[in-house]
A protein has these predicted regions:
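Acidic, PIN/NYN-like endoribonuclease modules and their adjacent C-terminal/linker elements
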Residues: 1, 102, 106-130
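Acidic active-site catalytic centers that drive phospho-/nucleotidyl reactions
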Residues: 6-8, 40, 98, 116
Length: 130
């Protein structure tokens, strides 16, 4: 299964959360992380006291788990528009960065691994809530 990690799931994995580690080991034949999630993580690292440590750990995790990074491109931007319009028609709002994360997930045809239940409102992707 292709698993796309949401920002909160990466954070929990980095802290050794058993449910995340188990889900990734069991379901994650192929692992992806959206560049948008990397942006959120870098923002948090820059605000914190252990920026270099956290950045190094992120690079190590990406390399060790052979994660592919999903970049935002024209195809992802189109999917973003589709998802945004679909949610707007339902009267549903989710955070803008999460729209981009959903679009990245849609781009690779993966299942989003997250703790955020609002992703279940996105009909275009499969979601696994932890």
């Amino acid at each position: 299964m292709k698993l796309v990690l949401d920002t909160n799931v990466y954070c929990d994995y980095a802290e050794g959360a058993p449910d995340v580690v188990e889900a990734m080991a069991h379901y994650g034949e192929f692992l992806f992380i959206p560049s948008v999630a990397l942006g959120e993580l870098n923002y948090a690292f820059m605000k914190g006291r252990r920026q270099q440590f956290n950045e190094r750990k992120l690079r190590q995790v990406i390399n060790r788990l052979k994660m592919d990074i999903i970049d935002v491109n024209a195809d992802v931007a189109r999917k973003y528009g589709m998802i945004f319009l679909s949610l707007e028609r339902k009267g549903t709002k989710i955070p803008i960065n999460d729209l981009w994360i959903a679009a990245c997930c849609m781009e690779v045809g993966g299942t989003l691994l997250t703790r955020d239940k609002h992703f279940t409102q996105v009909d275009q992707i499969d979601v696994m809530i932890l």
